[in-house]
Amino acid sequence: MGKCQVISHPLIQHKLSILRRQDTSTKDFRELVNEIAMLMGYEVSRDLPLEDVEIQTPVAKTVQKQLAGKKLAIVPILRAGIGMVDGFLSLVPAAKVGHIGMYRNEETLEPVEYLVKLPEDIDQRQIFIVDPMLATGGSAILAVDSLKKRGAANIKFVCLVAAPEGVKKLQEAHPDVDIYTAALDERLNDHGYIVPGLGDAGDRLFGTK
């Protein structure tokens, strides 16, 4: 079973509390999502493998460490996942970015996929799926399904806020996928929103309703 790790760094928790506020502006919301994503990036990349490499400094030759193994890919679930991409790219600017587009059927609460655009070598990459919220788990499961159909095997799911119901469903559907979140909230309400949550992340990021 994949782990679900709550990243409780003080800076992340402070920024998340501001993000949740109803009166946080679109501009501030967008900036906070980017900042929290960057801070989370340090934690979710903690186990990336390193290798020795010989370099020449201005003074002498020396053996130092650099990232080894698989290259990285950031895959946001559209729309809201876009807000987390730049935070990750500020840490790993060479990472490729794919996109998986989905919308939620408001009657069934089930996700509907409308776009999949991925790097050609996605099967050779360590993948971070990013989406601010893990609610029912439907979008996350469908995103992992789409990636695995294309040969991807090393996948992590990164969100800002998760509901226990979504975590459980994703772990049951894909026990090999680790989940990283800044908060594990109480529950889902009857409309499939996380409580206390932060509202509709996509609308708050882009100033839409």
Swiss-Prot record:
It catalyses: UMP + diphosphate = 5-phospho-alpha-D-ribose 1-diphosphate + uracil. InterPro entries: PRibTrfase_dom (IPR000836), PRTase-like (IPR029057), Upp_B (IPR034332), UPRTase/APRTase (IPR050054), Ura_phspho_trans (IPR005765). SUPFAM superfamilies: PRTase-like. Keywords: Allosteric enzyme, Glycosyltransferase, GTP-binding, Magnesium, Nucleotide-binding, Transferase. Coiled coil: none annotated. Pathway: Pyrimidine metabolism; UMP biosynthesis via salvage pathway; UMP from uracil: step 1/1. Transmembrane segments: none annotated. Binds 1 Mg(2+) ion per subunit. The magnesium is bound as Mg-PRPP. Pfam families: UPRTase (PF14681). Its cofactor is Mg(2+). 5-phospho-alpha-D-ribose 1-diphosphate binds at R79, R104, D131, P132, M133, L134, A135, T136, G137, G138, S139, D200. Uracil binds at I194, G199, D200, A201. GO terms for molecular function: GTP binding; magnesium ion binding; uracil phosphoribosyltransferase activity. Allosterically activated by GTP. Gene3D superfamilies: 3.40.50.2020. It is an enzyme of class 2 (transferase). Its EC number is 2.4.2.9. GO terms for biological process: UMP salvage; uracil salvage. Belongs to the UPRTase family. Catalyzes the conversion of uracil and 5-phospho-alpha-D-ribose 1-diphosphate (PRPP) to UMP and diphosphate. This is Uracil phosphoribosyltransferase. It comes from Streptococcus equi subsp. zooepidemicus (strain MGCS10565). The gene is upp.
